[in-house]
Each structure stands twice: as structure tokens, then as C-alpha cells.
Amino acid sequence: SHSYDSIRDNFNEAYFIAWKNGQTGYPLIDACMRCLKATGYINFRMRAMLVSFASYDLWLDWRKTSKYLATQFTDYEPGIHYSQFQMQSGVTGINSIRIYNPVKQQKDHDGEGIFVREWVPELKEVPLEYIFTPHLMSEGFQEIYNCKIGTDYPEPIVDHGLQVKKAKQILYGICLLYTSPSPR
């Protein structure tokens, strides 16, 4: 829908670069991006999560992020790729908004941190209690586990809860604007 065309006009290049390079401070996002860059493949749920994160947490325009991922997927199929991107980024106006929480996804799909530790070696010594949110480690633990947050591995570049709240307000506002009955 054209109603959504200009909602993400202020493209944040720094967020885009961090997302592309697996440097967001969200371990599963970073592991997926690094795995994709190295192998050309990640499963459907992880693809959906990457799009959700780029679209809602980073508020990046789906047209730019979709072009980048199209160059990374070895199984790229335009007819599937672009329609999925539009749906996952909430710009169709007909699908419900699907926002994936990267910490919850990691707990559900990499509960032991095996995938994350493989693709984000900076976190290989981080214990399970912090593998989902390494930025919550104390400075002492960061030293013990050889992972200084902000130096070896980034702080989360955005606050997931805050960004999702903003995204929902904007997107639901557009939906209400175009679905509310007109005054008589």
C-alpha cells in the first residue's frame, strides 16, 4: 500500500551497516547475519526475524534491506522474497504485524547458545545465563569471560521494547487512519 511508502524515509546507515555485519548487540541477529554472509542460507524463521528486526527495531526501509538480503541468499527467488519482505515489514496493510523478539527467539531456538557461539566467537566463553543478553554481564564477568561489551562485542544498538512500541504506534496509526469509518 502506498500509505506506507514514506514512513521510513530517514534511513539510518549506521544501523544498516551494523545489521549487515552482525554487530547489533543482539546475539541471534548477529549470528544469523554472519552465518548468512558465510553460507548464503538461514532458515525461514530466522529470515523472518532478521526482517522484523530491521523493519521494526531499526526502522529501516524494507526496500533497501530486501535488496541487500537478495544478494546474500543462495536460494533467492524474487516472487517469494519481495512479498515476504513486504508482509514481514508490515507494509501490506492486510497482514497482521509480526514482530519477533530476538532474545525470545534465541531462547526458543538456540537455548544452549550453540549456534550463537559458533557464529559470534566473541561470545564463546560467555556462560548460558548471559548468552542471550551479554550486555547485562558485570565488568568483572566481562573480564572473566573475555568479552568486554562495547569493545569485543557491541551493546545493543537499540532498545527492543522501546523501538517496537514506536513501530506499532506508527503502523497501527496508519491502519486506523485508513480503516476508520468516515464521519457523516
Regions found by a protein language model. Give the residues of each.
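Generic, well-ordered alpha-helical scaffold segments in large soluble proteins
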Residues: 31-35, 49-57, 68, 72, ...
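Short, flexible active-site recognition loops that position polar ligands and cofactors
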Residues: 150-161
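Short acidic alpha-helical/loop segments enriched in Asp/Glu that coordinate divalent cations
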Residues: 1-2, 47, 61-68, 79-84
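Short acidic (Asp/Glu) and glycine-rich catalytic loops that position anionic groups and cofactors
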Residues: 7-13, 46-49, 93-100, 143-149
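Gly/Thr-rich phosphate-binding loop signature of adenosyl cofactor/nucleotide-binding cores
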Residues: 1-48, 57-60, 88
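C-terminal, helix-dominated tail/subdomain
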Residues: 57, 68-146
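Catalytic core of tubulin tyrosine ligase-like
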Residues: 167
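Conserved small/polar residues in nucleotide/adenosyl-binding loops
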Residues: 178-184
